């Protein structure tokens, strides 16, 4: 297995962020492999990726019929070759500078390092309704699943590839796929460590406050809660 750090980027209309995120990853991570999975972007994201990838240094998958974060991540996972695998939300490129710290943490007995908003030193600067709902959803996850993790909906992590020998990512859903993965890791007694980060304010406050976006946010929240109970039912079976 290659001694690389494979980072997966899942994109859909990320023209504002993709170039900066790739730049920050390349700036801060040694022995880097970038895998990009694009789901039918129409805002110029594809053209930016193609321009940056003229020398074919990234692995890029273009999907025309799918817009599903979980399946995009799983598809990217199949293209990785590193002994460490990570993921970062494409609009959080400024936090790529934290990956060296996370990679160093993996040199210990820890199997996955997770950036967390809800431990000492972390925080959430988004609009109140999003920050409030996200925090207490994570409290609910911890209470129901009985897993000692405070941020199940983090957008940044890195793990040892060996975890995949015993735990599988289920490729459906939105960010809730990671919730179930963390639960299954805990059941298999893998070691998870959280390190703090502060989530920035929404990039477009006006849009974040709009009714359609809050409706979508509420719907995703419902699906996340549903995933908690599906996870428990799957365990019993």
Language-model features: locations:
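Active-site acidic short loop of glycosyltransferases
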Residues: 2-3, 31, 55, 80-83, ...
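Acidic helix N-cap motif at the loop->helix transition within catalytic regions
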Residues: 16-20, 43-52
